[in-house]
Amino acid sequence: VAGPQLDDASMERACSLAGPTTTVVRTCPGLAHRIREAAAVISMGGYNTVCEILAADTPALIVPREVPRLEQTIRARALAGAHLIDTLSQADATPEALSRWLNGAVTTRTDRSRIARGGLAAAAHAAMTLIAPDNDGDLQ
């Protein structure tokens, strides 16, 4: 899944480099389900994709985009430090390194059950606490 922002020339190159059993697409409806069902995932470190990965027990290797911002690299390093994903820099993501990682990853699952996933409910509670009327009926 190349993503909707990949330019046409890069998409054509990716398609031409793909092997006979590989399909390159821009988008993939139902990606969360495919991540859950996959033996392993190699991905860039975009926010939405990483959230989908963290919701599954699929082993994941994140190869973060390093320019124009370090956002993905920072995210990948933090998650790797918590032993939730593996990460490689773009320079280290050679075919050999990717193959080595895949060979080990496809026989395992990653336990991410310790991740607190109640952020939406916690945010709603915090907002309600901040705007709840005080004893005089005034908003705090």
Question: Each PLM stretch: what is its role?
Answer:
Residues V1-A40, T73, A91-A93, A97:
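Donor-nucleotide binding loops and adjacent catalytic segments primarily
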Residues R13, E37, A78, A97-W101, ...:
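Alpha-helical elements of Rossmann-like donor-binding domains used by nucleotide-donor carbohydrate transfer enzymes
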Residues L17-P20, A55, A82:
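Short, well-ordered coil/turn elements that cap or connect secondary structure elements
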Residues T22, A60, I85-D86:
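Hydrophobic anchor at the start of a short beta-strand
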Residues V25, V63, L88:
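Hydrophobic residues at beta-strand termini and immediately following loops
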Residues L31-I74:
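A donor-sugar binding/catalytic signature common to diverse glycosyltransferases
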Residues S99-Q140:
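C-terminal amphipathic helix plus adjacent low-complexity
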